[in-house]
Amino acid sequence: MGAKVLIHKDNIYVFHDENVLGTSLELKVAATSQKNADRAEAAVLSEIQRESKALSSYDSASEFSRWAATRGQAVPVSKELFETLSLFDQWRARTNGALDPAAEAVIRVWKDAAKADHMPGQQELAAAVQTVRQPHWSLDASAHTATHLSSTPLVLNTFVKSYIIDHAANAALATSNVDGVVVNIGGDVVVRGILSESIHVADPRSDAENSKPLAHLILSDMAVATSGNYRRGFDIQGQHYSHIVDPRTGQPADGILSATVIARNPVIAGALATSFSVMGADESRKLASSMSGVEYQLVQRDGSKVESAGWRKLASPSMDLAMAAAPAPPRPLPVPQAGVWNAAFELDIILELTHFDFPVRRPYVAIWIEDKDKFPVRTIALWQQKSRYLTDLKNWYRADRMRSMAEGSDLIGTITSATRSPGKYTVKWDGKDNAGKPVKAGTYFVNIEAAREHGTYQMMRQEMDFSGTPKTAQLPGGSEIASATIEYRKAQ
């Protein structure tokens, strides 16, 4: 189970896995050797698996699922489940009900409405809200038991991922000769030990892996979590609604596009990120002011940003993080220059890696552009493993010019963002070459190459004309990449 080392630089070892807690894992370990880094990785994956077996709401065999099937019985539970239920009690009180595992009752009403393609009835929503408000369990600290009191569906999301990441990071640091660790699961990140990590905050309006971030943070011994409504939701009669609901009203929480929270305690970061997405700016500001060491950035529906007083202190000085009090005026579209890439357009490349039902290492992937003469123009993405296996990406590696520019680096860094599904990635091309200059309009080849260490190989290649007319191509899947969509369109 688990990934093998991807990058080794200055005694920092990097691992990637897919399908970890329903999303993707990035792990960085500062260790004295490959062997010690491997041990730290094994400790992280073991701790994640152990706690998932206790807390998962999606595994019918988990301790939580088995407890949820009981009614009115004082059931002895593990330390992790007891602590998690207790934390939910605390956060439900702190947020005046904005954070509640029983929100699943409301979410199911909206899911059913989306399937039927009609708005949910007010009576149905009111009934769901009423079931949320009742008590769902009682805890006995002396006996260490939990009694399930209601039949309301419960899902332990929100801060639970951060809770597990916290313990996984501690497990890595407990390994001999490991001095630092960064654990990033689905955009929730914990940085511990000697490492200082550069973290990009995804823009909810342009959330491709290589899109320009909203902010560039430098964190040490801290956690950051992001919640947002831009990757999932409900579509009803042509209208999109947030998958994040306010359990107090039964309505989708669509006032906040993205909420990013920094705190030393990962649980606080995770709980507040979700809560702020529900509560809105004013209520969030009030709650944050009652807690020390919490910084945040909210992106509101109109695009304006709300930031805590200390947010910019954690940002890289190279980034302009000026807070917008109101939405910026729309920029005029660039005037196309004859014979040059139309700057009003961009290329989206949407990949879905082949899905497995267990954690599996991410394959080597290179995505690059060639001109009509097959001359390499730009490497858009490079997901490395051990450098000696880069030759497995034989077509990309053959282009010496591209290799010399990108070898030894992973072109996508650590990102905090709303959780995405495992193996699903989007990257963009802005029509510029590796030197940052716009290319000529015309015909190019989009190349996607994937290889697994000691495993299978896949090459995808699509010719496309980039002259200002939107177009889409769907590439057939294969052993490593299940599907790929290439979309040339006006930039959003």
List each model region and its residues:
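Mature catalytic core of soluble alpha/beta enzymes
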Residues: 1-336
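Short, compositionally simple motifs enriched in small residues
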Residues: 96, 280, 440-441, 453-454, ...
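A short, polar/charged loop-to-alpha-helix boundary motif
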Residues: 265-270, 387-395
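Primarily secretory-pathway and cell-envelope proteins
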Residues: 330-382, 386, 455-492
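Surface-exposed coil/turn segments at beta-strand junctions on protein surfaces, enriched
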Residues: 340-342, 420-422, 439-441
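Extended, solvent-exposed segments with strong compositional bias
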Residues: 393-437
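A short tyrosine-centered beta-strand micro-motif
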Residues: 425-427, 439-449
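Surface-exposed loop/turn motifs at beta-strand-loop junctions within extracellular Ig-like
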Residues: 433, 450-454
